[in-house]
Amino acid sequence: MAAAKHFTYVILGGGVAAGYAAREFAKQGVKPGELAIISKESVAPYERPALSKGYLFPQNAARLPGFHTCVGSGGERLLPEWYSEKGIELILSTEIVKADLASKTLTSSADATFTYDTLLIATGSSVIKLTDFGVQGAEANDILYLRDIEDADKLVAAMQAKKDGKAVIVGGGYIGLELSAALKTNNFDVTMVYPEPWCMPRLFTSGLAAFYEGYYANKGIHIIKGTVAVGFDADANGDVTAVKLKNGNVLEADIVIVGVGGRPLTHLFKGQVAEEKGGIKTDAFFETSVPGVYAIADVAAFPMKLYNEIRRVEHVDHARKSAEQAVKAIKAKEAGESVPEYDYLPYFYSRSFDLSWQFYGDNVGEDVLFGDNDPTAAKPKFGSYWIKDGKVVGVFLEGGSAEENQVIAKVARAQPPVADVEALKKEGLDFAAKV
């Protein structure tokens, strides 16, 4: 076996967080040969949200190298050449199958070994597949998932092969809503199926969801709620032809896209680090219970200062910010200095069709819907406040300008008191503007 390759710093994972961590290391003056990124993917880190949005456009679709990190936040695009110039080693198409934190050694599926002084775990999440639950027929062709660029390429190929066909989207969350819009824009006949009483149940109230379901229905998307896919039919070639639902219905399908959630990829570290909330427990600097080992983005269960509790956040904004925080903390520690604790304000957003919403804060407590949430409105603009213990703790806004979105973020952070809920409903966005 070849000798282990040693690096001062290793980032394990090649997603959004890896790209932002590499940029921060470069800013902090990392020396050539000190840093490596080890990734299962075959390309340099890229902005993952593009896969469910621009990548699927019928015209002028986004393609690499156009959306390598860090363009998603208005930063420099880090092409593979950038890593070479900085002396950062990109070790791609490499799957790590064993991590021994005691000996600071990583082993790949090809039996290559890598050692490090400091490790950043940025392994992200894997998609939950219907085959994991033994759903009958779930291994048929053109039952697709979306997590990485390889998945996106399979989806694009299927869309071209099954042009103007029937698409069934299983799941009513982020991926379900964004991909239903993408497939409809590509002239597919689209049906969404999900078990919950409304879409995006982890964030949306029934009032918010009613707008999006109405809007999608007006676009010709069929929505079937309160049931799940229990089986699939395929033709002699193994291509999917139908989706069988628990309620007895059978839907014709040329393509099925499944978006039923993800699981943080922490299995390599089981029994070696403290865990919480399904992730790897860290402090406010993203250091784990093992000194010199950090966990960022999807896998980190970190102290959310604003709400005084440990949380895990699966979102690109947190992936970027946690990566930067961890690298700053690593370099500060080496210099005998300190950095402020991570103080994250939860943020989610989505764009589909002509719609664009943003949410900041916490969606707990009483919700107060404001504005016009008529799905037939030419330019819909509405939102919701969440009130807990007499204070605004979360704000959602559809159709906001950049300035208005900044205002709602400020409100979610400031948590102003609310004396009169009815007055708040009438004031709507004006309340936020006064904070």
Curated annotation (Swiss-Prot):
A Pfam short name: MDHAR3-like_C
Reaction catalysis annotation: 2 monodehydro-L-ascorbate radical + NADH + H(+) = 2 L-ascorbate + NAD(+)
Annotated positions binding NADP(+): 174-178, 202, 261, 314-315, 349
Tissue: Expressed in anthers.
Enzyme class, broadest EC rank: oxidoreductase
EC number per UniProt: 1.6.5.4
Residues holding NAD(+): 172-178, 196, 202, 261, 314-315, 349
Cysteines joined through disulfide linkages: none
Residue positions binding FAD: 14-17, 41, 48, 53, 96, 147-148, 298, 316, 349
InterPro entries, A to Z: FAD-oxidoreductase/Apoptosis, FAD/NAD-bd_sf, FAD/NAD-binding_dom, FAD/NAD-linked_Rdtase_dimer_sf, MDHAR3-like_C
Location(s) in or outside the cell: Cytoplasm
Signals that turn on the gene: Induced by cold stress. Induced during senescence.
PANTHER family linked to this entry: APOPTOSIS-INDUCING FACTOR 1, MONODEHYDROASCORBATE REDUCTASE 4, CYTOSOLIC
Family classification: Belongs to the FAD-dependent oxidoreductase family.
Protein name as annotated: Monodehydroascorbate reductase 4, cytosolic
Encoding gene (name): MDAR4
